[in-house]
Amino acid sequence: MIIKNGMIIYGDEFTIVRSDVLIEDGVIKEVGKNIRAPADMVIDASSHLVIPGLINAHTHVSMVLLRGLAEDVPLQEWLQNYIWPRERELKRKDIYWGTLLGLVEMARSGVTTFVDMYFHIEEVAKATIEVGLRGFLGYGMVDLENREKLEVEIKETEKFYEYVTKINSPLVNFVLAPHAPYTCSLECLKWVSKKANQWNVPVTIHLSETKKEVEEIRKKYGMTPTQLLDEVGLLNEKLIAAHGVWLSEEELRMLSSANATVVHCPASNMKLGSGVFPLRKALDLGVNVALGTDGAASNNTLDMLREMRLASLLQKVAHLNPAIVKSEEILKMATVNPAKALGLKSGVIKEGYIADLALINLRRPHLLPLNSPTSLLIYSARGGDVDTLFVNGEIVILDGEFLTVNEEKILDKFLKVIE
């Protein structure tokens, strides 16, 4: 496979080059001009920007089912009065078709990899394989300090671990997924810590999303949520903590020292009125910061191109400083940084890296002129501009059409499911 004459965002410094890309066995074999090699397919990318596949480091894909369900309310009310009651009604088939729809939406914004926690998680895995994206998936554990509930959550988590091991798919990876320090008991968190070491897998969790959450944890345990994770053995390089809006400077230093990752979810944090993540401070302290959409119920899209734009604009207006964050830093949060968190040799277009690539069609009115490809990607591109997508060197979308699934069938089935 050769991608010919594209405008390439090359390497981890995002150098712009007009070049070809040779893909062999799912890996980028060569990047250079006028590549001459045997190829089963040649794609003309002369009118395209070729970018690393984006990584959505925190989402709940099947929550597209709940898009628009509850608006203009704070997080706790949103969860307790709207989301959790509706989730109790969802069946396996709902999760399956909801995931398919969400994956199609994500793919069209250039997402090749995502991190997801939810229930009926086997259905998420099945849909992930069908569409051809790469998922790091976990059963969302919530025990609310109920011993019987904890036993159920442990059983479900172990069952999914066995499922992932059995199917042995390169597209489905297991993560442990305790929901949050305020919904999981100490016993639950300690069990997760033990299993993370035993199974050598990442741990994704919601952390310091709201001011109220931090105050409740302080009152209950006499420490911050980050200190609590440290206490139970979860503060390490395996940790992928979502939101982090109310992290203190001390906690950011702790996360940096532990080589943990924080996932910034700007749209969700703005929509729920949770606050503004201290991005500049986190980056300056050496925290590995990734980017995520959260679920479509609190965003309300899964468009990672939009999320990059919001991440940049939010910091500029919050600090009244247009230079506070650079486009290249934002792009790293959607590529290089989450790849590091997941131990994935992806997020970069370079020889030896996994061929996760997205081609953006530049022949669109809102994408011209091409003065700065990187800033154009951050501030002008949007979901739907991606017309070709590779995951592991396999084509998922070609010239705007899915090769792996029937998009129209998914739309029809989804509409029937939500009737």
Curated annotation (Swiss-Prot):
**Which positions in this protein are listed as binding substrate?**
E87, H179, E209, D294
Q: How is the cofactor bound?
A: Binds 1 zinc ion per subunit.
Alphabetic keyword roster: Hydrolase, Metal-binding, Zinc
Record-annotated disulphide pairs: none
Entry binding sites for Zn(2+): H58, H60, H206, D294
Its UniProt entry gives the catalysed reaction(s) as:
S-adenosyl-L-homocysteine + H2O + H(+) = S-inosyl-L-homocysteine + NH4(+); S-methyl-5'-thioadenosine + H2O + H(+) = S-methyl-5'-thioinosine + NH4(+)
Q: What Enzyme Commission number does this protein have?
A: 3.5.4.28, 3.5.4.31
What are the protein's GO molecular function terms?
5'-methylthioadenosine deaminase activity; metal ion binding; S-adenosylhomocysteine deaminase activity
Cofactor(s) of this protein = Zn(2+)
KW Methyltransferase (keyword) present: no
Q: Does the keyword Flavoprotein apply?
A: no
Q: Which HAMAP family match?
A: MTA_SAH_deamin (MF_01281)
Family according to the record: Belongs to the metallo-dependent hydrolases superfamily. MTA/SAH deaminase family.
Q: What does this protein do?
A: Catalyzes the deamination of 5-methylthioadenosine and S-adenosyl-L-homocysteine into 5-methylthioinosine and S-inosyl-L-homocysteine, respectively. Is also able to deaminate adenosine.
- What this protein is called in its record is 5-methylthioadenosine/S-adenosylhomocysteine deaminase
Query: From which source organism is this entry?
Result: Pyrococcus furiosus (strain ATCC 43587 / DSM 3638 / JCM 8422 / Vc1)
